[in-house]
């Protein structure tokens, strides 16, 4: 191996914004609820903060949801911090649900227009300790909080964040077996 072979690994990294550093601080200390209270009814959130949060949501949405542990509070956070969607109604798919959560009415916020992406999530980690589900829903424009950002498109996920209570005609297309190693 030559020194030149390492050039691709030694490329300059993009600068982390102050907004992202702040959000990482909030996330690492599980201070989301306090943060929501501090911005509620305050001055409007900057575009830079919304874009930084959107990237963090794409990367860590499941963990943020788990840390907040209250979908009504999470919905408030998403409504305040995500860039506003300005598009048409869509048919969306979700594979990020397992049967236990679905049966409890806990439907997730992240959906895609690409059924193959939803299938991947339905068969994967989301089929842990319970069968995975592939869902289809009609999403009126008013139900979509944010469309895909550049990072989501780069990952090939084309993730739309929605208010699940505003979706209609949610149907289970397929059920995948529980992939837990130990049952």
Question: What label would you give each PLM region?
Answer:
Residues 1-91, 98-109, 115-183:
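Conserved NAD+-utilizing ADP-ribose enzyme module
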């Amino acid at each position: 191996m030559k020194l030149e072979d390492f050039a691709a690994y030694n490329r300059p990294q993009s600068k982390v914004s102050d907004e992202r550093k702040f959000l990482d601080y909030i996330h690492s200390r599980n201070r989301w609820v306090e943060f929501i209270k501090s911005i509620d009814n305050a001055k409007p959130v900057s575009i830079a903060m919304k874009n930084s949060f959107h990237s963090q949501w794409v990367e860590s949405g499941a963990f943020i949801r788990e840390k907040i542990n209250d979908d009504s509070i999470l919905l408030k956070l998403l409504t305040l911090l995500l860039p506003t969607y300005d598009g048409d109604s869509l048919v969306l798919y979700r594979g990020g649900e397992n049967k236990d959560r679905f049966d409890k009415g806990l439907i997730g916020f992240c959906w895609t227009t690409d059924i193959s992406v939803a299938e991947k999530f339905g068969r994967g980690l989301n089929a842990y300790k319970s069968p995975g589900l592939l869902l289809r829903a009609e999403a009126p424009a008013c139900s979509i909080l944010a469309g895909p950002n550049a990072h989501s498109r780069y990952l090939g996920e084309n993730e739309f964040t929605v208010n699940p209570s505003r979706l209609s005609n949610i149907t289970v297309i397929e059920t995948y077996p529980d992939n837990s190693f130990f049952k």
